[in-house]
């Protein structure tokens, strides 16, 4: 797949980062670069709304303030503290990550994608989030919100329908990350998809991407498609 033209990439990066400077959300896990805290937030946010995660994130870190504290805890207690976020395999996996990290890496979460993804419950997205949000690496992320934004901006409706899987989206996400700005750029992508380029009633009329968005031409009455 040929990538977007460099001028389009630059426009997208500038528009998104400018939007984020004005509209980015103030979330508690964005006030830290501690890998453990970033990990907790990312695992909690899987399939769970931000508003539900915020109080539980704070409560969980009061109970288990470090990877060492979590690894030393009984898994039943970890699951109890997790309730009622749901998807109860997540606290079990988080506990397993803590124990394996203590046993194999001296309590320091790895800082390379391959080793991170070998840990239980860490996939490509979570590894990218840890690398960009905790370690300052130029790593891409791809979740539901990011996929929707990229699909609308860069793919015409017909070509989007022909896509299968996420391979091309990951490739595009990697092309788009601006050198040295992955932290802000990735946070901006998630916020933009969650609050602006939403599944229903996206704000196409006020969108900073409207001058070059492939979907903007077909966005009518708040319906931008997938």
What residues fall within each predicted segment?
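Catalytic cores of DNA base-excision repair glycosylases
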Residues: 3-10, 14-15, 19-222
């Amino acid at each position: 797949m040929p990538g977007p033209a460099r001028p389009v990439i630059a426009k997208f990066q500038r528009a998104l980062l400018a939007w984020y400077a004005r509209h980015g959300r103030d979330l508690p896990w964005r006030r830290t670069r501690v890998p453990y805290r970033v990990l907790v937030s990312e695992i909690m946010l899987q399939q769970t709304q931000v508003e539900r995660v915020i109080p539980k994130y704070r409560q969980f870190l009061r109970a288990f303030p470090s990877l060492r504290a979590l690894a030393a805890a009984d898994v039943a207690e970890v699951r109890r503290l997790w309730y009622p976020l749901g998807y109860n395999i997540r606290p079990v996996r988080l506990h397993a990550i803590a124990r394996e990290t203590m046993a194999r890496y001296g309590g320091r979460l790895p800082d390379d994608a391959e080793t991170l993804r070998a840990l239980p419950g860490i996939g490509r997205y979570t590894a990218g989030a840890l690398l960009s949000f905790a370690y300052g690496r130029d790593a891409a992320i791809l979740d539901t919100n990011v996929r929707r934004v990229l699909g609308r901006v860069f793919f015409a409706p017909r070509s989007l329908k022909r896509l299968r899987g996420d391979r091309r989206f990951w490739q595009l996400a990697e092309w788009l990350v601006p050198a040295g700005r992955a932290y802000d750029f990735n946070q901006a992508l998630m916020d933009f998809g969650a609050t602006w380029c939403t599944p229903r009633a996206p704000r196409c009329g006020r969108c900073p991407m409207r001058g070059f968005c492939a979907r903007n031409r077909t966005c009518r009455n708040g319906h931008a498609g997938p």
